[in-house]
Amino acid sequence: MAVMNVNPTRMELTNLKRKLSTARRGHKLLKDKRDELMRRFLDLVKENKALRIRVEEGIKQANVNMEIARSAMNDKSLSVAMMLPTQEMSLDSSEKNVMSVMIPVFDVQYKTADKNDIYSYGTAFTSAELDNAVSALSEIMPDMLRLAEIEKSCQLLAGEIEKTRRRVNALEHVMIPQYEETIKYISMKLDENERSTTTRLMKVKDMMLEQAHHYDDPFGM
């Protein structure tokens, strides 16, 4: 790891030690965040798998019932039956914060008095299979909305996990080792300078003692 281009001074050493301490704390916090994001992501993936199976099965069953109803009814009767739905709804979209990631939240608001009133037709000229198809689609609507929430949330969490992973790796493999190597280098340089200064002082001391000895004995006796 390359040493940073800094002056090997005690002030710089203190500054780098402070930065290293901050980097280590940041590294731990980011690792904890990454691990928690992964845990939540995997929980959502598990829920997504179960929901998708349920939704696909519900749509499949609704399609089967609709085909049976279409074969039992003429096209005009089927079109009239489905023309004017009695149930109205609106979709409210909001967001919630999960580990600094804003994920979507969908909420259905029913505008009719009875949200279970899903049939827009009378039963005199329709088949039971049409009732079953409409009922199946109505039942899976909440699951479809939740599935949309989860899939978008997984996409957003995956992006944040990757971004956090890159930051963790940058700290772990680049910044922290570089700080450590630079601190080691500066400490070594300061030790060398201190030893060099001590050696020079010892030489000066010896010279001064030798000169003092000559002054005390000017005749060399």
Predicted segments with their positions:
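Charge-rich amphipathic alpha-helical interaction elements
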Residues: 1-221
